[in-house]
């Protein structure tokens, strides 16, 4: 049998210390280190690099006033020779203003021109074979990584990614299990050792027979490594072993010593692995350890972020990935429980057929299901329940999907299962919808019940084993279908971090890798200065001009507005030429502005005048050469467009398509985070002036387009825009543009928000039908988009694109950032979908009864906007509906569905008042539910209620004094 070959490469990873050359010659410690390196060049495991004539830049700015605004106040630092020490120990207690907190791996990647997740052709002659701790592996030492990774290559084939998903269950009797008291009852392992040569995919279930009542059957007491090696080679997918708990603990250690790329758990860093460590301690076993090339290390589980996030750092190439931490970092969900996450991902639209004591589920062949069906049928193979309207239904028959559990991973069986029907048992909740969404989640087995382990029989243990199996498969499927490995690769390359650190840090730390790389490419280094951070105005939001819009409205927005602003004005901290602050003196403002126009002309420079309260502030930027931050944005934007193009080109190659999708995602995050970092005091190269300029330029651009387009007319095939000056060059723009639309109309700006405008169109003549109206409106909006974005018209600079995004046929503009309407999703045939922002319809903290009342009220208003009803008819309908609804609630208050009155809130655990009602509610709940506690950052449901001792006539009046 052909086996894959695994090599381990050893490199020298140093501690890095950067300072100017002069300091290295005057400081006694640095001088001693440098002399030793020079003296013992070949034997001393340290070195240094001289960085000649580096450009030193700073974010510090000297504020000017009316009395000195003509003076040159730009802080200019001389070029300097720097020295970068590379030592096996950390150089401490020596201050160097150049020694930023750059991760040691980033220096390694940059100095050796290596992509952390790149592919390279390796010349083995650059390696030296060495003996290592693990005798089963081949290892090499590399003295010159730059030479070794000289030839990058592109891989368009699937590179196997091996992972193992682990889930444990523990014995308990109603209280939360603790390792010093309760044994582990089950460990389930989804062993997914992918390989192009010899893949091994198993579901291994370990069951503690010692706690099973009157257990009789095959059992394992002594763990023998070679037995497991042999077992894994057998052609059997499901392996169930009844064993002692000690055997289970040895098996976990055996698993961790295999060459997996990922160890997957869900909340396993804070519970599963901590519990396993505790049980090993209970038996006086050594703690779990990881074997790397040169030694064995104990598995270290640590917490930061106030004990809400637990991490396991790996030093042997395995990535310990807690999917709970990953989901919380990447997504914003109501709940981060595995069951709720699964429902979000694994669902399809299906037809429901009532068939006696069962329902038949028939998935629909729709566009919405197209990208979901293969995922759904992969997950359902181990599921025992499905969920409809959040109600669990036990699966009765899925033999058309999988009739032999040994075919769990069989690709032909999976392919043949797509769109096959399955049956579910009926329960106390009938399904009234003919078509509905069917979701997969954790199985509806309440192992948290205090009686789950009472009279614990083999049958009971097997039921829990099925549940445990499905949990591990869910984790594996989340990993697979969320393309987590592709994201790890993309973020690793983007942040210049080892792959196991891809999701570890926040934006301020993540971006420092790209910052260092850009600085190094420019032969530059930063010196941070003292800056004043003041609050400044945010994005420009217009008040809605109308509430009820019964005509066609388009949404236009600036594509990547803030990154475009940074490129346009060269908003990099070292490019701030002047900041002049004036008091409330318009005469002085005019003098300063005229001076700046003459002394700092566009396009070499640009400036922004910002008025706040009774002060004026001029910020002048040097545009002659792109700054460091501008280069980062510009390169990121170009890469984003390149990845977008490559993604489309490779849509038939799933490997490259997934890679470019994730690369595009990581680029977007980087590009969009830089504006916020400029205004963050935690970022090394920040600038409140650049951040304020960026926001002000955004306001200026959106106001400019608003003033240019609002009430502009298209008459006799000519569009007449309003007279405006270009916001960048201050030159007047052309206002007349010819077309061939053959209609007369007027554009109205009815709303705007930060980077977008809502443009309403009013035609002089009526159309015969809705389709013609929509088609012509689309044509007119497209014409406007072409006019604004055509570089020949010089309405915008080349860095900006004001895109026509979507079109509403009616809208309700309720308030700023709150609107509802119907969007055109397809032109031919005409199809509409509902859309809303900021309303209770999509807010998580609003009750269902609130959403229902709002939705029905909107439907009445929609009828008014689309069917020419009178306003009086609409008012009557709304009043009658609301009166009926509230009367019905009051009269049936004893029989109301409590679920309709639930509110949702995120528990922060940080409240000024210790008696705050949310804090008291959570503490009370957690004391009663120790095995299902609400943790910090988790969203939960609650209701406002008052306990009634006697239900009398007075209480029935529902007086507010009885509510709390």
From Swiss-Prot:
Q: Does the keyword DNA-binding apply?
A: yes
Please provide an example of a Pfam family that matches this protein in its UniProt record. DNA_pol_B_3
* Keywords carried by this UniProt record: DNA replication, DNA-binding, DNA-directed DNA polymerase, Nucleotidyltransferase, Transferase, Viral DNA replication
What Enzyme Commission number(s) appear in the record? Answer: 2.7.7.7
Tell me the domain of life: Viruses
Sorted alphabetically, which InterPro entries does this protein's record hold? Answer: DNA-dir_DNA_pol_B, DNA-dir_DNA_pol_B_CS, DNA-dir_DNA_pol_B_exonuc, DNA-dir_DNA_pol_B_multi_dom, DNA-dir_DNA_pol_B_vir_insert, DNA/RNA_pol_sf, DNA_pol_palm_dom_sf, DNA_pol_type-B
What biological process terms from GO does the record include?
DNA-templated DNA replication; viral DNA genome replication
Q: Could you cite one Gene Ontology molecular function of this protein?
A: DNA-directed DNA polymerase activity
Q: Which reaction does it catalyse?
A: DNA(n) + a 2'-deoxyribonucleoside 5'-triphosphate = DNA(n+1) + diphosphate
Q: Which PANTHER family match?
A: DNA POLYMERASE CATALYTIC SUBUNIT, DNA POLYMERASE DELTA CATALYTIC SUBUNIT
- Function of the molecule: Catalyzes DNA synthesis.
Entry similarity comment: Belongs to the DNA polymerase type-B family.
The protein, known as: DNA polymerase
Which organism's genome codes for this protein?
Choristoneura biennis entomopoxvirus
The gene is POL
């Amino acid at each position: 049998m052909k086996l894959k070959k695994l090599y381990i490469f050893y490199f020298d990873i140093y501690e890095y210390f950067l300072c100017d050359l002069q300091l290295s010659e005057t400081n006694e410690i640095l001088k001693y280190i440098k002399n030793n390196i020079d003296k013992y060049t070949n034997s001393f495991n340290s070195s240094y690099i001289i960085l000649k004539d580096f450009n030193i830049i700073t974010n510090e700015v000297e504020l000017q006033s009316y009395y000195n605004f003509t003076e040159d106040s730009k802080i200019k630092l001389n070029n300097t020779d720097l020295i970068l020490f590379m030592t096996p120990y950390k150089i401490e207690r020596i201050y160097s203003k150049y020694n930023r907190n750059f991760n040691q791996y980033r220096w390694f990647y940059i100095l050796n021109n290596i992509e952390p997740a790149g592919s390279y052709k390796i010349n083995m002659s650059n390696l030296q074979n060495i003996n290592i701790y693990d005798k089963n592996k081949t290892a090499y030492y590399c003295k010159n990584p730059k030479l070794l990774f000289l030839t990058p290559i592109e891989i368009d084939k699937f590179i196997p990614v091996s992972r193992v998903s682990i889930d444990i269950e523990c014995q308990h009797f109603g209280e939360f299990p603790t390792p010093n008291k309760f044994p582990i009852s089950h460990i389930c392992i989804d062993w997914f050792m992918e390989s192009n040569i010899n893949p091994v995919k198993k579901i291994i279930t370990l069951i503690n027979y010692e706690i099973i009542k009157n257990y009789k059957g095959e059992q394992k007491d002594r763990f023998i490594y070679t037995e497991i090696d042999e077992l894994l080679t057998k052609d059997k997918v499901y392996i169930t072993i009844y064993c002692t708990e000690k055997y289970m603990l040895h098996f976990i250690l055996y698993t961790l010593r295999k060459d997996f790329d990922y160890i997957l758990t869900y909340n396993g860093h804070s519970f599963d692995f901590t519990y396993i460590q505790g049980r090993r301690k209970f038996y006086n076993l050594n703690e779990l350890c990881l074997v790397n090339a040169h030694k064995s290390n104990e598995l270290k589980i640590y917490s930061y972020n106030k004990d809400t996030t637990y991490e396991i750092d790996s030093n042997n190439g395995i990535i310990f990935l807690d999917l709970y931490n990953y989901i919380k970092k990447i997504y914003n969900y109501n709940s981060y429980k595995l069951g709720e996450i699964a429902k979000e991902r694994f669902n399809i639209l299906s037809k429901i057929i009532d068939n006696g004591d069962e329902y038949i589920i028939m998935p629909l062949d729709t566009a919405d299901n197209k990208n979901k069906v293969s995922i759904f049928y992969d997950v359902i193979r181990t599921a025992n329940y499905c969920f409809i309207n959040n109600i669990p239904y036990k699966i009765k028959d899925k033999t058309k999907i999988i009739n032999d559990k040994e075919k769990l991973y069989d690709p032909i069986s999976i392919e043949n299962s797509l769109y096959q029907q399955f049956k579910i048992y009926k329960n106390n909740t009938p399904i009234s919808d003919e078509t509905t969404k069917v979701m997969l989640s954790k199985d509806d087995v309440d192992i948290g019940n205090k009686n789950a382990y009472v009279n614990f029989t083999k049958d009971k243990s097997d039921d829990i084993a099925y549940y445990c199996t499905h949990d591990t498969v869910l984790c594996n499927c989340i990993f697979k279908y969320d393309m987590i490995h592709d994201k790890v690769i993309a973020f690793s390359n983007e942040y210049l971090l080892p792959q196991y650190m891809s999701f570890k840090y926040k934006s301020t730390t993540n971006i420092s890798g790209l910052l260092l790389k850009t600085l190094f490419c420019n032969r530059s280094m930063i010196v941070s200065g003292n800056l004043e951070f003041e609050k400044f105005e945010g994005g420009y939001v217009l008040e809605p001009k109308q509430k009820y819009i019964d005509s066609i409205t388009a949404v236009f927005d600036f594509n990547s507005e803030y990154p475009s602003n940074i490129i346009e004005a060269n908003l990099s901290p070292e490019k701030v030429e002047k900041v002049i602050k004036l008091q409330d003196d318009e005469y002085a403002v005019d003098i300063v502005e005229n001076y700046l126009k003459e002394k700092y002309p566009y396009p070499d420079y640009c400036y922004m005048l910002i008025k706040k309260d009774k002060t004026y502030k001029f910020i002048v930027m040097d545009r002659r050469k792109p700054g460091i931050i501008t280069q980062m944005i510009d390169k990121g934007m170009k890469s984003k467009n390149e990845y977008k193009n490559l993604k489309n080109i490779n849509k038939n190659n799933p490997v490259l398509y997934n890679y470019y999708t994730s690369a595009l995602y990581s680029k977007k995050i980087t590009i969009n985070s830089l504006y916020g970092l400029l205004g963050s005091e935690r970022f090394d190269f920040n600038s409140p002036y650049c951040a304020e300029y960026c926001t002000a330029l955004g306001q200026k651009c959106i106001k400019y387009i608003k003033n240019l387009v609002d009430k502009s007319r298209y008459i006799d095939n000519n569009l007449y825009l309003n007279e405006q000056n270009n916001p960048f060059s201050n030159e007047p723009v052309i206002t007349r543009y010819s077309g061939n639309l053959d209609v007369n109309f007027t554009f109205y700006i009815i709303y705007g928000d930060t980077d977008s405008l809502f443009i309403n169109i009013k035609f002089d003549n009526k159309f015969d039908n809705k389709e013609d109206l929509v088609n012509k409106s689309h044509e007119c909006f497209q014409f406007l988009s072409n006019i604004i974005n055509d570089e020949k018209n010089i309405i915008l600079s080349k860095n900006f694109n004001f895109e026509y995004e979507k079109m509403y046929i009616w809208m309700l503009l309720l308030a700023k950032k709150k609107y509802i309407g119907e969007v055109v999703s397809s032109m031919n045939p005409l199809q509409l979908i509902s859309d809303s922002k900021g309303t209770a319809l999509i807010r998580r903290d609003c009750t269902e009864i609130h959403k229902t009342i709002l939705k029905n009220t909107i439907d009445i208003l929609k009828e008014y906007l689309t069917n020419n009803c009178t306003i009086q008819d609409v008012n009557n309908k709304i009043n009658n509906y609301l009166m009926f609804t509230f009367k019905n609630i009051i009269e049936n208050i004893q029989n109301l569905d409590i679920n309709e009155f639930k509110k949702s809130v995120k528990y922060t655990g940080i409240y000024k008042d210790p008696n705050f009602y949310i804090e008291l509610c959570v503490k009370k709940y957690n004391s009663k539910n120790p095995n299902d506690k609400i943790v910090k950052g988790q969203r939960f449901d609650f209701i406002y209620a008052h306990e009634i001792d006697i239900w009398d006539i007075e209480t029935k009046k529902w007086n507010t004094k009885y509510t709390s």
